[in-house]
Amino acid sequence: MTPKRALISLTSYHGPFYKDGAKTGVFVVEILRSFDTFEKHGFEVDFVSETGGFGWDEHYLPKSFIGGEDKMNFETKNSAFNKALARIKTANEVNASDYKIFFASAGHGALFDYPKAKNLQDIASKIYANGGVIAAICHGPLLFDGLIDIKTTRPLIEGKAITGFPLEGEIALGVDDILRSRKLTTVERVANKNGAKYLAPIHPWDDYSITDGKLVTGVNANSSYSTTIRAINALYS
């Protein structure tokens, strides 16, 4: 029997972002929880980034953000999570036909590379065209900017409903002015630009995720589990 396989994408960007000079990159909790959930539901999981590189968002590594089983999986060198992470592939090394689910994780690093990550977009569009699922969380839906539905040659999210990290959350984090000064976009703008309907959570930290056919999106790290479960359910719907 062919194993069920999911592909989790990471942002390749790891550079200064915050006002204190700290670097942004991958939000570790998002991928810890999604990886664990996929594994517990019988999926083999691989990681990919546009360049094959990645780095952690330095604001979200403290113990206050990582605890319990997440902390154990992150700190244990031979955990399934770290073994998979050590095998991370560049996007052009991936065969899209090997996977049923493409899961775009985030972190503010995604603001920099996802909208122009053509190879990741190509993988996602092929998985979707083959009847698979595209899921994205937090800033992950920025990957949809320029992502084309192979069958229609239109934006893949056109006419669909998506969610993702809201501007209200950027304001609460004190980074909205950074986005403006560096001309970085938001999930809501990407939705509007590509003909999708953006659905905002009541509060930016709510566990909120939605499904529209084979397209699944979630708002933040608190939505990692529900978004992953929705992606699995969408595959079999």
UniProtKB/Swiss-Prot annotation:
Its main location: cytoplasm. Keywords: Cytoplasm, Lyase, Stress response. GO terms for cellular component: cytoplasm; cytoplasmic stress granule; P-body. The active site is at C138, H139, E170. GO terms for molecular function: glyoxalase III activity; protein folding chaperone. The keyword Ligase does not apply. Induction: Induced during entry into stationary phase. Its EC number is 4.2.1.130. Disruption phenotype: Results in higher sensitivity to oxidative stress, reduced thermotolerance, accumulation of higher levels of reactive oxygen species, and reduced chronological life span. The keyword Metal-binding does not apply. GO terms for biological process: cellular response to nutrient levels; chaperone-mediated protein folding; methylglyoxal catabolic process; methylglyoxal catabolic process to D-lactate via S-lactoyl-glutathione. It is found in: Cytoplasm, P-body. It catalyses: methylglyoxal + H2O = (R)-lactate + H(+). It is an enzyme of class 4 (lyase). Belongs to the peptidase C56 family. HSP31-like subfamily. Homodimer. Catalyzes the conversion of methylglyoxal (MG) to D-lactate in a single glutathione (GSH)-independent step. May play a role in detoxifying endogenously produced glyoxals. Involved in protection against reactive oxygen species (ROS). Important for viability in stationary phase. May negatively regulate TORC1 in response to nutrient limitation. This is Probable glutathione-independent glyoxalase HSP32. It comes from Saccharomyces cerevisiae (strain ATCC 204508 / S288c) (Baker's yeast). The lineage of its organism: Eukaryota, Fungi, Dikarya, Ascomycota, Saccharomycotina. The gene is HSP32.
